[in-house]
Amino acid sequence: GYTEEQAIEEASRCLQCVKPQCVAGCPVEVPIPEFIKCMREKKYAEGIAVIKSKNALPAVCGRVCPQEEQCQVRCVLGKIGEPVNVGRLERYLADWERDHGFQIPEKAPPTGKKVAIVGAGPAGLTAAADLVKRGHEVVLFEALHLPGGVLVYGIPEFRLPKAIVRNEVNY
């Protein structure tokens, strides 16, 4: 990962485009220029909150999401050189949050509705996080020993440490 100095230097490369194509390339439409602007201003808590408004698993996505084929490939800087390394910036903020205390995103008042989700892989975890934010009570059912699905059982430790998955799941 980046040091703080490297992260700010990389974030400073972002052109803050009026019509950011990087956001269009992101499957969950993370407001990329917005979180990068927070990073430049050293507002790390705000930056991770921006990411979490759309992405429940930033530490995972910052490590294994194929940014070079999605958001980064659409960065205009890539036309003349290297695009902004969005994934490493997302990872930096997620790791910063882990080291400084997790923030629980705001959630709506309880609705009284209870939702069961079968499968605690990435899709199930994301659905659970979105439903909890909307005020619903969620119960996850998982056939295997640990939640995380492919994140735990399909991605090798050197690529995605299990501790990272555990932290994301437990928040």
Predicted regions and their residues:
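Ferredoxin-type iron-sulfur electron-transfer modules and their immediate structural context
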Residues: 1-114, 162
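Conserved beta-strand elements of the Class I
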Residues: 116-118
